[in-house]
Amino acid sequence: EIGSGLVGSEMCIRDRYKVVVDCLLHLRSRYDIQARISNRMAEAEILFRCGLLQAATEELSRAKKLAGQYEMTALLMLIRQTELRYLSAGDYQGMSEKQLVEKQMKVNETFKHLRSANQHMQLYDILKYRALYRSKVRSEQECQSLNDLVLSELHLIANNTYNGFEVDKLHQLFQSTYFLQSGNYKAAIRIYQQLLELFDHNPGRMLNPPLHYLDAVLGVLDSLLSAGLYDEMPFFIAKLHRLTESDYPQEFVRKVLAFIYLYDSFRLINCGAFADAQELYKQHEETLFRKLSQQKLDVQLLLQLNLVVLHLVCDRGGEARKAMTRIQATGLVFYNFPAFRIARLVNLLLQAECGRFDFAENEIKSIRRSTAIGNSSVEKLVFRFVRLFPLPGSRRERGRLWERLYGTVQALSLIHISEPTRPEP
């Protein structure tokens, strides 16, 4: 009896699961273009199998019109091939040989465009991966590798006979990510703004969720933050707020809310408005920081690192060390994210301040060994400063020490925003 009850319960769960999925698919088809096209193709196939060739062809034409309008190249390719299959099954009635050849040429053109778009997306994916999991370009080898990607992308653009929203979007995404990765923030901001204008002029072309639009807004904010243009940031943060008001998946909305907090917080911290930054944290402590597990790992790391920095600027060294301990306790989970390298540098300062000089020296060696290329100027400055501990006891001596370091700090803060570091593609 127990066994039969379990089987019945499992079947009930499966039936309910199917009902829920069917309802979600039906709701999705109302606003998702890809779902609408797929549904029309499915209807055409049903009509074709029922022997209603004319009706099937008409339904397929509607799907083809939608796919062409929204540049769904992969679906358009499948539709054109299906259309030829239907025509073949109907013995090409009412069609001349010239018309048949024209349809075949359309398939070839679509295939060529699909191949070019796929190569373009692959190049962008490689560049985006480097931006996510590697730091900014520092070595000649990295510079050459990045330039090779740029040349490949330019070659694709030059030989692409098709122009449209998707091509422009991918090209501007690639360029803006390239400039951001190479440290040319002014150029990155300019391209990102062009990309946002492209989305604004084509509101119906945004994905659900609008991942590429989000990448563009975050790219602008990252560039503005790096360039110290804090007064320009609220305008683009407001664009993130508008994304949370739309009917997008909850996971996407939670991610956007986290980035709204992060950029608002770092803007206030960099402006010296520490009290406002602390108040902002209190407003989000329950909704964001106590629900970190709902965020992806890279966002969790950024939020925890932000909390460490907030404690430091508010002169709460003990709380900063506790927050850093939570990051370190996570171990290798965060290791591959670029922000973890920043966390290690901040931890160096905390440990040196506590007098753990042996640990700090070993950590410096570990950080140096963890990269195949040389350390960045910021890392070298942190290493140099940590090795000055214990700091002089007198305020005068500390002032002299700061004067010696101040020039280097200022030079580093301006290095990326004075002149472009790479030629524009």
Where do the language-model regions lie?
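"A position-specific structural signal for the A-helix of alpha-solenoid helical repeats
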Residues: S38, A42, L75, T82, ...
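Helix-turn-helix repeat elements of alpha-solenoid scaffolds
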Residues: K18, L52-S61, S96-Q104, V137-L154, ...
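Alpha-solenoid helical repeat architecture
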Residues: E71-L78, L114-M121, T161-K169, P203-D215, ...
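Single conserved hydrophobic/aromatic residue that forms the stacking wall/gate
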Residues: I2-G8, I13, I415-P425
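Amphipathic alpha-helical segments of tetratricopeptide repeats
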Residues: S61-G68, Q104-E109, V150-N159, Q193-G204, ...
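Long, internal scaffold/assembly segments composed of regular secondary structure
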Residues: G164-D298
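Amphipathic helix-loop-helix modules that constitute alpha-helical solenoid scaffolds
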Residues: V20-C50, L87-N159, E166, A372-L414
